[in-house]
Amino acid sequence: RRRQRQMCIRDRYQKCVSMGVTFFDEFQVLDIKIDDGVCKGVVAYEIATGDIHVFEARAVTFATGGFGKIYKVSSNAHSLTGDGPGILYQKGIPLEDMEFYQFHPTGIYRLGILLSEAARGEGGILRNKDGERFMERYAPSIKDLAPRDMVSRAIATEISEGNGAGPNNDFVYLDLTHLGAETIKQKLPDITDFVRTYVKIEPIDEPIPVQPTAHYAMGGIPTDVDARVLSDANGTILPGVYSAGESACVSV
């Protein structure tokens, strides 16, 4: 999936270049200009020079991603602090579903680097400090293959009840050792590379310390199915303002 994302980004970038799109790299949007309820453009900060720029536009699309960096441990980039939703909130736009955030159950302890569900799909087992396969208690039929929310809650419960590992009892183990060296090398190469590089653990021989990691914002800027921003609970459209991707929220 990572390679697919890279290909998508490359193809979209090349398409923009072919259409003559101008990019303003390393600019930080500070504010949106709205006059009489209509979008007029944005105000941005040029990081390299410290200059403030005003961009006039009849339409603005917020695609600023999530806000995972409000959490201590997150898979998100450092830039994902909710600036897009924050700018519109300051303009009186009520944000939606902000209390809902997806936690990936198996981020590398303290680092937020995600270890794919493929590890558990291949037979990886989650264990607490005592070596117990605790998911048997939370999801007896599907065990470690339970959905993300169930597994994350189970890990959080184990930690809160004192069953976490380490000196602070704040992580559990993802155990791949029983899979064998060949299976791990052939089917889980990315995971093994991450673990060897960032925590200096050999997953063929040792279990991996993991913890629930803030991953995806369910809430954000309220939009309709056409990406148009809604300015109130009645679904009033804010002309010329759009949001797409993780910064947007169509609710459920």
Residue ranges and their predicted role:
Residues 2-9:
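Short, small-residue-biased leader/transition segments that mark boundaries at the very start
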Residues 17-29, 95-98:
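A conserved beta-strand/loop element that lines the FAD pocket in flavoprotein oxidoreductases
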Residues 24, 30-39, 44-45, 187-248:
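A glycine-rich dinucleotide-binding beta-alpha-beta segment and adjacent secondary-structure elements
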Residues 48-59, 237-240:
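Core beta-strand elements of the Rossmann-like FAD/NAD(P) dinucleotide-binding domain
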Residues 57-59, 63-64, 244-245:
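Short, well-ordered coil/turn residues at beta-beta hairpins
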Residues 62-75:
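Flavin (primarily FAD) binding-site architecture
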Residues 66, 103-108, 214, 247-252:
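Glycine-rich phosphate/pyrophosphate-binding beta-alpha loops
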Residues 87, 93-202, 206-209:
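An anion/pyrophosphate-binding glycine-rich loop and adjacent beta-alpha core
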